[in-house]
């Protein structure tokens, strides 16, 4: 019996190491903004947060709610497709789901760039995600007191941005302007 030659043992290992490298997946393109910040706010968090706030005074399945809660802003009358507690649950989820869109670079309505790279803005977006998750958990209980309690969480998450970037002196068109700390 012949003893194997070292080359015969090493060659297969060498050939295995000479394979072409695995292709690297291309990075996903950065999301593109199609709305300014005002349009985004009016399209998503405004109507959906109002659905949640509506539960402070109205039962989603009460007789006075004949129209869709989720799209009541648009007057989808006599529709129960998105009504009731399911509409409340969906609106809570919508807040969490859409919150990352607030990090996509875009302009404010006044043409200034939205402060999406600011640490406090990013923290407020995370706060909105958490508020939506908390509201969804409360909506699953179908308990109006739970919805009343979670409303403060939603308000606080919105105020984290509004107090600094929206509710400012508008005489100089300063919405979205990053102010230097005093």
Residue map of PLM features:
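Bacterial N-terminal signal peptides that target proteins for export
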Residues: 1-8
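C-terminal motif of bacterial Sec signal peptides marking the signal peptidase cleavage site
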Residues: 15-17
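Bacterial signal peptide processing site
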Residues: 19-21, 159
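Extracytoplasmic c-type cytochrome modules immediately beyond a signal peptide or single-pass transmembrane anchor
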Residues: 23-153, 167-182
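The canonical Cys-X-X-Cys-His
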Residues: 154-165
